[in-house]
UniProtKB/Swiss-Prot annotation:
Subunit-level organization: Part of the 50S ribosomal subunit.
Organism in which the protein naturally occurs: Stenotrophomonas maltophilia (strain R551-3)
NCBIfam families according to UniProt: rplV_bact
A Pfam family per the record: Ribosomal_L22
InterPro entries: Ribosomal_uL22, Ribosomal_uL22_bac/chlpt-type, Ribosomal_uL22_bac/org-type, Ribosomal_uL22_CS, Ribosomal_uL22_sf
The family this protein is said to belong to: Belongs to the universal ribosomal protein uL22 family.
GO biological process entries: translation
Coiled coil regions, renumbered to chain: none
Function, as annotated: This protein binds specifically to 23S rRNA; its binding is stimulated by other ribosomal proteins, e.g. L4, L17, and L20. It is important during the early stages of 50S assembly. It makes multiple contacts with different domains of the 23S rRNA in the assembled 50S subunit and ribosome. The globular domain of the protein is located near the polypeptide exit tunnel on the outside of the subunit, while an extended beta-hairpin is found that lines the wall of the exit tunnel in the center of the 70S ribosome.
Keywords: Ribonucleoprotein, Ribosomal protein, RNA-binding, rRNA-binding
Protein known as: Large ribosomal subunit protein uL22
GO MF terms held by the record: rRNA binding; structural constituent of ribosome
Gene Ontology CC annotation, any one: cytosolic large ribosomal subunit
Length: 111
């Protein structure tokens, strides 16, 4: 029994989000939420909301016991990149890439 939640086009770079995702991969769901709650990184707040959504999906759609769930899969993929322009000296310009992420969390019963 698995439940999935996806956050698309989150305004954080995949590199920064993967640092937090690696910490909670494979943990029991409640422990993962608790760990993310006390992290001060921006990615932790976003990933916590996705994990809580996946837990709610498992509970409401499949009647799973919350205490039995663990984070089976957590993926952070690259989303669309916003291209911005920053003026520089002597009439030049530089591109600024504002990266986005797609965060996918799958929770399931611990085996």
């Amino acid at each position: 029994m698995e439940a999935k939640a996806i956050l698309r086009t989150a305004r954080i770079s995949p590199q920064k989000a993967r640092l937090v995702a690696d910490q909670v991969r494979g943990l029991p769901a409640e422990r993962a939420v608790n760990l993310l709650k006390f992290s001060d990184k921006k990615a932790a707040h976003l990933i916590k909301k996705v994990v809580e959504s996946a837990i709610a999906n498992a509970e409401n759609n499949q009647g799973a016991d919350v205490d039995e769930l663990k984070v089976q899969t957590i993926m952070v993929d690259e989303g669309p990149t916003l291209k911005r322009f920053m003026a520089r000296a002597k009439g030049r310009g530089t591109r600024i890439l504002k990266r986005t992420s797609h965060i996918t969390v799958v929770v399931g019963a611990a085996k």
